[in-house]
Amino acid sequence: MSTSFQEFKAFCNKVGLDFQWLNLQSSKSVPENGSSEGFSAVSDTVQENIRPATEPLNVNQSKDPVSNFFYDVKNAPLWNVYKRNHSGHSSAEACSGVSSRQAPKNIPEAMVKETVLSNHDNVTIINELLPTSSAMHQEESTAMTTSYLLSHSVNDTCNVMFSSSSHNRAMLPSSLVQRNNATTSPTTDSASENNESVPSLTSSVSTSSSVYSSWNPPHSPHISSFPDGNFASLNAEVTCFDFRRTKDSRTKETNESIIPTEIYCPTNSTDHHKHYPSRKSKQDACAPAPCNQNISCSVVSTAEFSQSNHTLTTVVPSYMQQYLDRPQNWFESKMGKYCPLFLRSTKNIDYDSLEFKFERKMIAVQYLLLDEQSEPRRYYNPSNKSIPFWKRPFNFDTMPSYDQLMEEAECRFYSYQYKYEGFQRIEPYSISCPWKNTQREIDLVLDHIHFSLDVGEKKSLNRKGNITLDTLDSKVDPNIQIKPYQIFPSNNLVYEGLPHPAEQSLILSPDTSLIERAFQALIDICKESIPSSNDCSTRNNNSAPQLTVPEPSKPCRLLLVRESRTATELKTNKKLWLHSQRRNIEVTVPMHPSERGTKSWLRKWLSTFVHQ
């Protein structure tokens, strides 16, 4: 067993997949004339049994090409598909080896006959319900498709023509698909109603944001299957594994994750073209299509499966960088959200884009922090129509808490309509009507809460947890100080651009919690404000070596003085600023690089004025 196949089995066990392989062994050879009598002779001597996926493969295989062929076939799935002969042999004659006497006792004869009669079309199908009744038949123009083949190649088996489907499709009629669904498991009753043939492995797949891409071993060519065009996929979702979330979801279709995995067996195409020269031009004309991958999940933190070392590597999402590098003119950079529409360079916005969803997520985070760290906030709202009109100019409403917004979103879960969706014109923040901005922020938080519920996280959504697609890893620090809510202008929950490089870590590292990222950004700002000290004296090479003790660097203290609201606070501030030991206190304030010259000149002027 090759190393790549062992790694694939380890990957399947990690995800939770379990396969049953078909074991075929035979000692007789396949006749070269391709007659139908040879198929029955081979079918009588074939012994089939189901081997568990954990049993190791037998590497000590014989040198006989026919036995090597059956050794390669024993890892094929239970669905075996082959073509009808062009020379006039019917599909019933090709399946003469499959009869009712070979069927197991628990399968009635009517079902076996129905299986044979249903194979009068271009495709001959052996049902999965007959695990011990089928044998692989091979003709000159007969091809076999398998979903999974051995990843190592055997040059002796090149005399037998077989190919691997690049799309991992299984050819099953709808009648057999429905019959297979009825015998899967009690947990897949809903899947049988939608004609889904593969059971959902809900108990073994987590709902994390990590995404495994389709596994393809290196240096494995994509071989196009059935270039003659006589096959048509009756059910395109037969071998695609339907992973459903274990949590309550709104619909079954929105929470599906289809993860196709394929293994291809590299074969010697030169020998195939020698034996089948007519197929060379047809295979060259049919280009292999790439493997389809349809994965619906959150894209806050994506993970790719590296083929080199087969480890998970976290990739920074592109929408975060696009949010930082969004185009802005001079008016937008100065006025921010309050910039009028006629002064903007970009006048339209896509509310369904990832950039806007990320901004909406940050607004929800700030709303939660303000709700936890401050008292119920009141804001001026003269547009409330539930009160008499003569009271509206003097009306102050209380902002709803985050718990109230969650309850409202859950009550209106099936009838909720997004306030901001689609491609629309930008709605600037109002300067004269700040209550409209506050109401807009509440609507954005409601949209984000409903979006988090809609992707299948209704049960795990709580007040301090999954308000975003990536959860807050740690609880909010209760000692954190947040600026009190301002009535005008309403710029409390507006998430503006991030000019400082230290603040960009709030976006570029989504694995850490919000408080840890904010604290690390503050440390980075303080480190950049501290000048580099070169207190260590330079070493003289001519003199003897000496031990130099560097002088301790001066401590950097960050002094925060809030505004004086009472007489006691005013007196305290006066004592602080007029104290004789004030010179030993160094105040370090981060500032923009363009304003450092002005700030230093202003600080010198103020210090001279205080000394005088």
UniProtKB/Swiss-Prot annotation:
GO terms for biological process, alphabetical: sexual sporulation resulting in formation of a cellular spore
Region (Disordered): 176-203
Biased composition (Polar residues): 176-196
Gene Ontology cellular-component annotations: prospore membrane
Family: To yeast YNL034w.
Protein name listed in UniProt: Uncharacterized protein YNL018C
